[in-house]
Amino acid sequence: MRGREFPLVLLALVLCQAPRGPAAPVSVGGGTVLAKMYPRGNHWAVGHLMGKKSTGESPYAYEGGNMKEQLREYIRWEDATRNLLSLLEAKGIGSHQPPQWEPLGIRQSTWDSKDGSNFKDMGPRLKVDGLSAPGSQHEGRIPQLN
């Protein structure tokens, strides 16, 4: 034997001597076919329940404790909410109307309301890429496409 083959033969002998058994523990009674397929239980809800927290920390969960203490806690939250609302209304933030936005610039209409057929003369404009703009010498000409 060569030196490289010896560790492989030794590994094969060790693996043959290892006890064979199920990868996951199965109940002694054997159980049904589904119990053998899912030895740790049914996993249909695993993805559905991921990230869910315990309801014990929720203020809305019924703890079965003292009703007077729960009522006091509710009244404290209600008072805190009222105080916050009054502070917001005092600053003017609590109004139900949406904020009035200022226009970005003063916009003037280009339409002459007295003469409904013409646009207002906006003064001379520049020529861009061979096309004439209103107010230029070539105004009114139809550009030719090549």
From Swiss-Prot:
Q: Which Pfam families match?
A: Bombesin
Predominant location:
secreted
**Positions of region (Disordered):** 95-146
**Basic and acidic residues bias: where?**
112-128
What are its GO biological-process terms?
Answer: mast cell degranulation; negative regulation of voltage-gated potassium channel activity; negative regulation of voltage-gated sodium channel activity; neuropeptide signaling pathway; positive regulation of behavioral fear response; positive regulation of peptide hormone secretion; positive regulation of phospholipase C-activating G protein-coupled receptor signaling pathway; positive regulation of respiratory gaseous exchange
List residues, modification Methionine amide. Answer: 50
Enumerate the UniProt keywords alphabetically: Amidation, Cell projection, Cleavage on pair of basic residues, Cytoplasmic vesicle, Mast cell degranulation, Secreted, Signal
InterPro entries attached to this UniProt entry: Bombesin
Q: Where in the cell is it found?
A: Secreted; Cytoplasmic vesicle, Secretory vesicle lumen; Cell projection, Neuron projection
One GO cellular-component annotation of the UniProt record comes to: extracellular space
* GO molecular function list: neuropeptide hormone activity
Q: Which residues form the propeptide?
A: 54-146
Signal peptide extent: 1-23
Q: Does the keyword Signal apply?
A: yes
Query: Which PROSITE patterns does the protein's record reference?
Result: BOMBESIN (PS00257)
Q: Which domain of life is it from?
A: Eukaryota
UniProt function note? Stimulates the release of gastrin and other gastrointestinal hormones. Contributes to the perception of prurient stimuli and to the transmission of itch signals in the spinal cord that promote scratching behavior. Contributes primarily to nonhistaminergic itch sensation. In one study, shown to act in the amygdala as part of an inhibitory network which inhibits memory specifically related to learned fear.
PANTHER family linked: GASTRIN-RELEASING PEPTIDE (PTHR16866:SF2)
What family does the Swiss-Prot or TrEMBL record give for this protein? Answer: Belongs to the bombesin/neuromedin-B/ranatensin family.
The protein, known as: Gastrin-releasing peptide
Organism listed in the record: Sus scrofa
